[in-house]
Amino acid sequence: MKALSRLLPAALAIACLASPAALAASFDCSKASTLVETAVCTAPTLSVKDEQLSALYQPLQHQKVFRELQRRWLREVRNLCKSAICLENAYDQQIERLTPAQPNPQAEAPTLRPSSDQQPYLQITDAPWQRFALATVPGVNPHLYTQVVDVAILDGVLNVVVFVGEHVDQTVRNAGNSYEKRYFGSLYEYSDARSGLHPIVRDIRFSGWNNIGANDQGERYAGIIDGVFYYRHRVKGEAEQSMAYTLGSKEQPQPSTQLFSAESGAKRFSKAMIATDLNYDNTNVMLHYPYERDGNTYDRVMDKNDNGWSVVNPMWNQTRPVLYFDNSGDFACVWRVDLVNKTLEKIVPEHEAVSAVPVDVLGQEALVYLEGDKLMFTIAPQQ
């Protein structure tokens, strides 16, 4: 292939010809207006890659996540290229990003063992995860209790349920237990195929977790199963009612005899045991491997001399040996604990980031979280 440095000056002197290679690009080459577009039209291999990428993107473009990923790729990667090799690599990168990852049933799960030297995990503070806002959460201020309740992919589309607690229900609060409380508030749904958040129900006494507001909020009582969001709310005194809402239906939630119940974030999908109760000591994370019989059975994730940790909202990835948590101490942001590579990565640096929940998008690792009044999305860098 010609080097782009030789290709681009030629593109300035002659119009893009309507050759078979040119017509293979995903856009009208007769209207190519930039040097990069002209280069794509003129180079046969780039035209093929552009067409391949377009075929992947077209069925996804109704979803905000993919529109934003494509926009950023164009602005920050492709359109900055100055060589043919750069363009080739840029297209390969985005084609890989938009290609659904195929599960490999033959792949063996990695063997998880504690570090032999008992050293803290390698700390990485500049992990290059892309992140951007999905929607604005209505009625949020710093004094409100706001949480991502659950996340699911339905028919290929990201769906999120958010709770905004507006004030504490004083009628059932146990003064002797700061976590024995409920909030009056509203539930909202987000679908990546339509803009904004939409109310599911307003002004309910929401019972989403056993220890609402705790570092580890305990057993979960609200979540998505097969496209239906189940939750509980207090109707009178200590009486609770289970409700069901079909995501995207815009209909009123209906009473349900089916209950949602799941383990706490510290335990659900766990690949090792968090050795301490984070509601009593959340200044570090120790991971215990109970099946290890010889030698050390613990991993120390943080340096014991670091004083900036206040670990909240632990959440395990369902399929990967990865733990996430928010940190409300001096190291505030969202962190990722990789049990295979023994790394502790800061993946969201903003101090306001909270309530991170993992999700796979096209088989790729991603998170949904809250930052102020914004519902946010972040996705892992490509390997």
Task: Show which residues each predicted segment covers.
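Sequence signature of WD/YWTD-type beta-propeller architectures
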Residues: 107-383
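Short loop/turn motifs at secondary-structure junctions
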Residues: 11-12, 343
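Bacterial N-terminal signal peptides that target proteins for export
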Residues: 1-11
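N-terminal signal peptide c-region/cleavage motif recognized by signal peptidases
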Residues: 19-21
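N-terminal alpha-helical modules
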Residues: 23-116, 170-178, 239, 376-380
